Amino acid sequence: MAVHTDIHPNDLKAFLTRYSIGSLLSYQGIVEGIENSNFMLYTTEGKFILTLYEQRISKDDLPFFCNLMQHLGRRGVPCPQPVIQNNGMMIGELAGRPAAIITFLEGEWVRQSNIYHCCEVGCSLAQLHLAAQDFSLSRRNTLSLVDWKCLWKRCQVRKDPLLREFGKKIDTELAFLEENWPSILPTGIIHADLFNDNVFFLNDRLSGIIDFYFACNDFWAYDLAICLNAWCFEHDHSYNLIKARGLLESYQKIRPLVPLELNAIVLLARGAALRFLLTRLYDWFNTPPGSVVVKKDPWEYWHKLCFFSNVGSLSELGF
């Protein structure tokens, strides 16, 4: 979450008349995150989250995201629910941006994960995958392998010295992944961004999953590989086998991986590291001036990419 677009109090009050969530008491921007502008709303009926969808999010995709959250919520996945307007619509417009209000989830995201958090994430990710099997809508992954090359070219336009540090390795990785990326694996809805700041906990128990705005149809095992990147490294860039084993075993108690997935998981983790390296690089150079947003360090994913590109066996991942 972040704030790229500010809103005027009078415009917000007028927008809220479309809902039955009480009168506005106060609101504040949420700094954490990258993609959209987010605000905490305090009304006479409680707390809510207002999201203004910025340029990377297509308005055409919003029904997919909102209906997916509804679908998952009905199947017991703890995620925010879109608040319906009085006219029955989920999406409105505010400050020239598509906008929606979702319910507020209790809990906090953890800055330093432990084995219990990783086990909870593994279990919940598998439950999410299974709960979405009968979801009727679909969406292409707009940040899949085919898109990484274009993203890298857009980064290189900047001619920044930082890019010279990454350049040769990224070119090599892109070529390798294009040559070896799997074409047939179990597929369904994936979250695609299940990082620690998108998962809430209460007393080490998972209480909510948020930010479904990268959700799409892709390999389930790729979603798991993203979680290995997001949850199983320490601040010194070392890979924590205990956390990884807990995450993987908890996932497989709900949905065991098939042999094809096991054979591909190292490659998928390598690809996931490259994906987040590239998006962080792009955002590092292209965050608009004046945005209230904390930019995320690309170097973190450089180290992860180097780790996964040198993994030689499943045991090194925690299997």
From Swiss-Prot:
Transmembrane segments: none annotated. InterPro entries: Aminoglycoside_PTrfase, Homoserine_kinase_II, Kinase-like_dom_sf, Pseudomonas-type_ThrB. Belongs to the pseudomonas-type ThrB family. It comes from the Bacteria. Pathway: Amino-acid biosynthesis; L-threonine biosynthesis; L-threonine from L-aspartate: step 4/5. Keywords: Amino-acid biosynthesis, ATP-binding, Kinase, Nucleotide-binding, Threonine biosynthesis, Transferase. This is Homoserine kinase. GO terms for biological process: threonine biosynthetic process. It catalyses: L-homoserine + ATP = O-phospho-L-homoserine + ADP + H(+). It is an enzyme of class 2 (transferase). GO terms for molecular function: ATP binding; homoserine kinase activity. Its EC number is 2.7.1.39. Pfam families: APH (PF01636).
